[in-house]
Swiss-Prot record:
InterPro entries according to UniProt: eFR1_2_sf, eRF1_1_Pelota, eRF1_3, Pelota/DOM34_N, Pelota_arc, Ribosomal_eL30-like_sf, Transl-rel_pelota
Recorded GO CC terms: cytoplasm
GO terms classed as biological process: nonfunctional rRNA decay; nuclear-transcribed mRNA catabolic process, no-go decay; nuclear-transcribed mRNA catabolic process, non-stop decay; ribosome disassembly; RNA surveillance
Function field: May function in recognizing stalled ribosomes, interact with stem-loop structures in stalled mRNA molecules, and effect endonucleolytic cleavage of the mRNA. May play a role in the release non-functional ribosomes and degradation of damaged mRNAs. Has endoribonuclease activity.
Gene from which the chain derives: pelA
Domains (record comment): The N-terminal domain has the RNA-binding Sm fold. It harbors the endoribonuclease activity.
Protein name: Protein pelota homolog
UniProt main location, coarse: cytoplasm
Upper lineage: Archaea, Thermoproteota, Thermoprotei, Sulfolobales, Sulfolobaceae
UniProt record similarity statement: Belongs to the eukaryotic release factor 1 family. Pelota subfamily.
Keyword Ribonucleoprotein recorded: no
NCBIfam families: pelota
Assembly behavior: Monomer.
Amino acid sequence: MKILEYDEKTGALRLHVENEDDLWLIHLVLSKGDIVVARTTRDVSMGNDSRRVPMVVELEVEFSEFQPFTSRLRIHGIVRDAPERYGIKGSHHTINLDIGDEIVIIKKWTKGLIDRIRKQAEKNKRVLIVLTDQDELLVALPMEQGIRILTERSLPGVSDEDKSLESVALEVSKEVEQYVKQYSPDAVIIAGPGPFKEIVRDKLKIKPRIYVDNVSSASRAGLNEILRRDIIDEVMRDYQISVASRELERGLSLLAQGSSLVVYGRDEVERASQIGAVETLLVTDDLLTLEDEETRRKTEAIMEAVESKGGKVMIVPKDSPVYLQLKNLTGLLAILRFRIN
């Protein structure tokens, strides 16, 4: 994401969308009543005919839709300004925002929202995770919106079809090279339970740096192991998803011990945030996209309070491995600096 222009007085923020995570963040920050300006197309009647015409419109947002791991955000609303000759003011319209597009968002920006936009604009690292042994292959791409599984399949056994270990490793390396070409990661982590991963590594012909680690299996369980380890921070310090996994694990451990250094639920978390007790706040992303504006505003206010007092806020997307655990705890969990009871 690139911030092209920001007018603090009018609240107009012009952005250039560079990847799917940018779209996800825009989806999270948009609220009903915000104004967006973007290029779009619309069917316009021309006499007896109609054709799709490109134009720039100003839209008052009603709601937005984003499907994780897609390259399009749909913004629905009412046209407030458009070329007069098309007569579409006051009509419903949907802007399809894609990677590479520009958008102007006009709203009342809180410090927390602007900080999240700026933080996203500073991010640039992407890592590809490859879990493999001679029987299985899983390739994943951690993103702000969750873990995108690119492939998860069984490999032809070494004894099948006269396949040798070397030939299976070559097959895996070629597939990984295609993903590297497609997603341009800054680094690749190859992990697995045995020596097969080193054979794959030796056959890879790629520019990104390669890291190797051991896990118990080339499966989603192995992926969760990687996300909890320090190696992930070496190559993806900008991603919250691995840190969030470990922070939730810490919070659950404190709960199991009956510790007063962890609270969950809106009322308890809100109270802790107001007195500066929150060290780390975990929030499920659906609390920021609710149609219930009051709940959304209260959640954003809690996040603002935590950040203003030096606490960390981590947004946990639906595709995160820890989403359901956090959701079962109301979607809000705070690890505290000091006891408040």
